[in-house]
Amino acid sequence: MTTVAMQQASAKMSTSAVAVGWVLRLIAAVILLQTLFFKFTGAPESVYIFTRLSEFISHLAAPIFGTNFAAMVARSEAFSRVGSGVMELVAAALLIWPRLPWAGAILAFAATAGAIASHLTFLGIEVQGDHGLLFGLANTVVACSIGVLCIYRAQLPFVGRHFQ
């Protein structure tokens, strides 16, 4: 979509849609940015979560790819923790950038949908006594991402022209 087409799509949005869009974008971005400190510094809760993730994937991969691959995956906690943080940093930046909120919403949705799936499978809703806070924050980001995608649907590549 060209810059002119994006501006025309944005110009057609009501003031309230623009305001709600910004609120949803900022909520999701703040939540994503807040978690980066814990991921990048190797906070014990983050290390615990990504160690469990690595063990879970290793357990699933062993029958398919063999024990050597599974052992390598089991040791990938730091890589997956920092990689997840980088993905969330990019998502937050794209959410805030006025030209690409839809891209940030897609990336934020993907990252946090994975977190929700982890909570619902092997982590549990409550992780190390957090009373479900991380699970709730992930659900909030997913809800905000869906809202952003609905509001900025006209800017989506390939399909956006059908919403104008």
Describe each region flagged by the PLM.
Residues 2-164:
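Membrane-interface extramembranous regions
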